Amino acid sequence: MIRYKIGLALSGGSIKGFAHLGVLQYMDEIGLKPDIIAGTSAGAIMGAFYADGYSPKEIFEIFSSVGFRGMTSLLPKRGGMFSTKNFMERLKTYLHHQNIEELPIPLRIVATDLDNGCQHVFSEGALAERIMASCSVPVLFQPVVIDRVSYVDGGLFRNFPVTVIREECDKVIGVNLGPETFRRYKKTIRGVAERSWQLVFRQNTRIDKEVCDLLLETFKVTKYGMFEVSSAAEIMALGYRMAQRSGMEHFLPIQLPTE
């Protein structure tokens, strides 16, 4: 098994995933590069594009300009309310590498195997399809079929994929965008759906939070709705400030003085 010095685990979180870009921006500025990345759902999207060679600002430009309607289309009676075809095409248009194993930074993508009822971690294969599998929210989006198996959002089993890379890394930095919260929620279809996802995330992230060497999370992200693209810049800035306060500079290699 290859041993990595610094691993980075990026949680799911829908629109809150823009906070990952703020964290990555700060890491770039201080010269702290992850040797491997694990991502679920929104974390898989941001992590994949970063591993593909895009800067955080470039990733922001790609996704902040397109709203929910621009990336989906209605698809009645096909396993989901919306088709992911438009989003898949956007991924394929921008990604430089076709397969996960070709990426400059090793990547693990977490999805849920809907047929067998378990977590599945992708470390190779077609990149765009596996990203899409990781973020296909059940009922809202149709499942992604890979090798005759149906996959949906990885957040059902592992929204915060620290344990996915824990054994491979000396240190793991984790960014969790689904912190435990008891905020009041609206008794609407959307409000109930978002609250239900929060409870799922709260239950399946506890172990992962315990095994981080550095955990980044903030309750401030909980105020944003799942598809509130208009707040993308604000959310990215929030992630940047969170990273600034984290003390991650201690993970930089010690520079010995030169004579």
Q: Locations of the language-model features?
A:
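Patatin-like phospholipase
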Residues: M1-T40, A48-E259
